[in-house]
A protein has these predicted regions:
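Sec/Tat signal peptide C-region and signal peptidase I cleavage site
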Residues: 21-23
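Noncatalytic scaffold domains of N-terminal-nucleophile
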Residues: 25-61, 65, 73-74, 78-223
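Bacterial N-terminal signal peptides
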Residues: 10-19
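Bacterial N-terminal signal peptides that target proteins for export
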Residues: 2-11
């Protein structure tokens, strides 16, 4: 018998990561969506059994397909996050951290999972101070790699799946794997972010080749 209760279990994942593509804090204060090139738009949507909301249609489709196959909200969130790490690297990814808020309708319980990234144990208070005694600028720190923390998102997804998942991880990675292996067109938001970061990302040969030399993005390493 089809169990409708699974579709009234709600999950929200907030992904926090130092984006690959960043603007100054002044830009973000004025418009927090500026670095992904998204306009503030309102759209009304309805659903009878379940609903998926992400910032990327491909991630939304991956999660929707999981729910249509009787997967749980946890399964859907994992599939969506794996796709988002590929299609919206300026905002999200396995190299960052996340928080999960999960409501189990059957048990009427709400849980949270802290998967925030952490700083290396060797980091001290002078980590972002130059030899001259001056603090690094924002971009000096980011491009130097010192702003990268120890990822927490993979552990969070693993804990979420262990407790609430019903579909194997091997199946949940398929949408992201196919996109990474065979390619996808960058979204409008990613395209705008890449354009705004010309002069930064294209300095590095690896990011230049991946983001700027092909219209279709293929990421075999991610796959």
């Amino acid at each position: 018998m089809f169990d409708m209760s699974r579709y009234f279990t709600t999950i929200v994942i907030f992904v926090l990561i130092y984006p690959i593509l960043m603007h100054s804090s002044d830009d973000l204060r004025a418009n927090p969506e500026v670095y992904i090139g998204k306009d503030r738009k309102t759209q009304i949507a309805t659903g009878k059994n379940y609903m998926v909301v992400t910032s990327d249609p491909m991630a939304t489709q991956a999660a929707y397909d999981v729910l249509s196959k009787n997967g749980t909200a946890a399964d859907a969130a994992i599939a969506a996050q794996l796709v988002l790490g590929l299609t919206e690297p300026q905002s999200s990814g396995l190299g960052g951290g996340a928080f999960a808020l999960y409501y189990d309708a059957a048990k009427k319980s709400l849980i949270t999972i802290d998967g925030r990234e952490t700083a290396p144990i060797s980091v001290m208070g002078d980590y972002f101070i130059k030899d001259s005694g001056e603090p690094m600028s924002f971009y000096e720190a980011v491009l130097d790699g010192r702003s990268i923390g120890i990822p927490g998102t993979p552990a969070l997804l693993g804990a979420l799946h262990e407790k609430y998942g019903t579909i194997s991880l091997k199946k949940l990675i398929v949408p992201a794997y196919n996109l990474a292996q065979y390619g996808f067109l960058p979204s409008e938001g990613l395209s705008k972010a890449l354009k705004s970061d010309i002069g930064k990302l294209d300095i590095n040969p690896t990011t230049r080749k991946y983001f700027y030399e092909n219209n279709i993005l293929i990421n075999h390493e991610y796959a």
